[in-house]
Amino acid sequence: MAKSLIFAHRGANKEAAENTRSAFDKALQYPIDGIETDVQLSRDEIAVLWHDRYLGKAGLPTKHIDDYDYSALQSMNFAAHFSASANPEGIVSLKEFLAAYRKRCHLLIEIKNRDWESASRHQIKVRHTLDLVGAPQGDAIMASSFNLDSLIYAQRYRPGFPLVYNFETDQTYADAQRALAEQSFLHGLCLPIASLNETTVKLLRDHGKSIAVYTCNSDAEINNALELGVDILISDVPQKALQIRAMKTGAA
């Protein structure tokens, strides 16, 4: 069986501000297999890396990322919330991220959709992401979303691109059965670690699908994911996950 791949969640987010170049570069100081990040759109429809609903970490707790054009986001400091001594860092665009990291490790790009956005804006985000990535090259770069409609649209727009359906904590085994039966194009599911069990693993393996899990930080969570043989283990502490994997397999 192939070993589980360790992905840094928004970079090394315990060592630098998440989704910044510093976080990605620090993550790559470890022998990680991949990086997970999040894509949203600026007001002028530039794909940028940002997870949260609001810009509280940039000192703007009532504002969204799409309240600002890309140029304004570049001038903001997205590192100050992590440490007052951190060097200022503006927003990272998806284009910059791909140019810097696509040849260095696997990438899992989560396309974030928000309730206040129109369906057309969701689709713009999908198109921009897939256009910037280009033709799929196996599972070197994958896209994911909690929004199944966005993944269905992505499959129509770029057939064959590896698309992963992210599950919420309240979704069930029956939801997984339904998704796999109705959406056979899915590359796999990304499950909350609390939802991972042998029954769900067997379901996904029987369908020939990939299994990713988030967010595995404790020893128990990491061990559970590794023992069940997930394909992708997403962690805020990738160095710990690497150490535990090495102890289990004899190699990092």
Feature roles, as predicted:
Residues 1-252:
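Phosphate-group recognition and catalysis centered on beta-loop-alpha active-site segments
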